[in-house]
């Protein structure tokens, strides 16, 4: 029997999908990311979305001002695509190194997406320019048709929207974000080097039964919503396969406790404090620790055409207890796996 490893050294990881919010929430949650991750793709869906170069620069400065002393962290900014976005603004931002990618939210698909795109073919000229300049398109892959069941919206998106985009723009780099279904995992595996996907810790660790059986657990509620076990197992098999098309994207999305624990709670899981230990635990369960570094630190940079990080982080087999809550002014934020113990800790 092979002895269990007691330490894991991997190149410093990056988070290819995160919500850092703004103001007090930003300063509260950012250190949990900047302590462990070297870079993060920052989502642009603030209450006033990031749609201009100037607003992206200003937001980046607010993020950098909140990075604790001693942390080395680079926020990678994204442009929020809208029906009326000027292609010149998009191009200028990318060529100046302000925008790393552009984000497509179908209108009303998730938190702060009311400004999103209601007619996707109408913004095909943006996609054409992005393909030309090599700018990645990040997609929240769900249809928003009220007639489509919430558990079917990702699978329907593949056929109705994603496949037509890929057919028309075959060399457009696309990240199918936070995938949740076997349909999506199979689609990415069958794709090519222009298609990648991020996978969150909660979608690898849990399915909809964990959220709904024995009482509703609002801190597992996110969008796309957790699916049935067969989809969870397909995601686990995909990351365990070692395919370089899958990479780390936490979709960490904090909300104040009262906004989650209410009669109409917000979608989002604040998983940044436990992200790397959670991924390590999953890969160990899958006997796939040999693929952990690539998933966390190599596949994403390769897809984006960025260098891998030079420094390393060390995970140690020491129990890691998640706090029950994290102070946020006079309120609090409930972290993913609150009050639970993980087998791995990041060595400080």
From Swiss-Prot:
Cofactor binding remark: Binds 2 Zn(2+) ions per subunit.
Entry keyword set: Hydrolase, Metal-binding, Pyrimidine biosynthesis, Zinc
Residues engaged in binding Zn(2+) 1: 17, 19, 103, 251
Cofactor(s) named in the record: Zn(2+)
N6-carboxylysine: residues bearing it: 103
Binding site for Zn(2+) 2: 103, 140, 178
Domain of life: Bacteria
Associated pathway: Pyrimidine metabolism; UMP biosynthesis via de novo pathway; (S)-dihydroorotate from bicarbonate: step 3/3
Keyword Hydrolase tagged: yes
Chain sites annotated for binding substrate: 19-21, 45, 140, 223, 255, 267
Residues annotated as catalytic: 251
GO molecular function list: dihydroorotase activity; zinc ion binding
Catalytic activity: (S)-dihydroorotate + H2O = N-carbamoyl-L-aspartate + H(+)
Enzyme Commission code(s) on record: 3.5.2.3
GO biological process, one term: 'de novo' UMP biosynthetic process
InterPro entries per record: Amidohydro-rel, DHOdimr, Dihydroorotase_CS, Metal_Hydrolase
Gene3D superfamilies attached to this UniProt entry: Metal-dependent hydrolases
Top-rank EC class of the record's enzyme: hydrolase
Cellular component GO terms, alphabetical: cytosol
NCBIfam families assigned to the protein according to its UniProt record, in alphabetical order: pyrC_dimer
Known role: Catalyzes the reversible cyclization of carbamoyl aspartate to dihydroorotate.
Subunit structure and binding partners: Homodimer.
Homology family: Belongs to the metallo-dependent hydrolases superfamily. DHOase family. Class II DHOase subfamily.
Name under which the protein is recorded: Dihydroorotase
């Amino acid at each position: 029997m092979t002895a269990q490893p007691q330490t894991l050294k991997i190149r410093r990881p990056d988070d290819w999908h995160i919500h850092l919010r703004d103001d007090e929430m930003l300063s509260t949650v950012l250190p949990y990311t900047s302590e462990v991750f070297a870079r993060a793709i920052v989502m642009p869906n603030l209450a006033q979305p990031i749609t201009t170069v100037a607003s992206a620069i200003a937001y980046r400065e607010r993020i950098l001002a909140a990075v604790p002393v001693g942390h080395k962290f680079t926020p990678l900014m994204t442009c929020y695509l809208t029906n009326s976005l000027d292609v010149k603004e998009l191009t200028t931002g990318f060529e100046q190194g302000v925008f790393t990618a552009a984000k497509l939210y179908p209108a009303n698909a998730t938190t702060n997406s009311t400004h999103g795109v209601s007619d996707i073919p109408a913004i095909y000229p943006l996609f054409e320019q992005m393909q030309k300049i090599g700018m990645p398109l990040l997609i929240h892959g769900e249809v928003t048709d009220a007639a489509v069941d919430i558990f079917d919206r990702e699978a329907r998106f593949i056929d109705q929207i994603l496949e037509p985009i890929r057919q028309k723009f075959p060399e457009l780099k696309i990240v199918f974000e936070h995938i949740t279904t076997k349909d999506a995992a199979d689609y990415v595996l069958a794709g090519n080097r222009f298609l990648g996907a991020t996978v969150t810790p909660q979608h690898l660790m849990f399915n909809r039964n964990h959220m709904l059986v024995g009482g509703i657990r609002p801190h597992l509620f996110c969008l796309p919503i957790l699916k049935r076990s067969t989809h969870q197992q397909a995601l686990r098999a995909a990351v365990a396969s070692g395919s370089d098309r899958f990479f780390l994207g936490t979709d960490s999305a904090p909300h104040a406790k009262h906004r989650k624990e209410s009669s109409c709670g917000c979608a989002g899981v604040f998983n940044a404090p436990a992200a790397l230990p959670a991924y390590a635990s999953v890969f160990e369960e899958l006997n796939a620790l040999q693929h952990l570094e690539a998933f966390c630190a190599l596949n994403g940079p390769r897809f984006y055409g960025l260098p891998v990080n030079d420094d390393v982080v060390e995970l140690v087999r020491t129990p890691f207890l998640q706090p029950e809550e994290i102070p946020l002014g006079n309120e609090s934020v409930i972290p993913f796996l609150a009050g639970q113990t993980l087998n791995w800790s990041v060595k400080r």
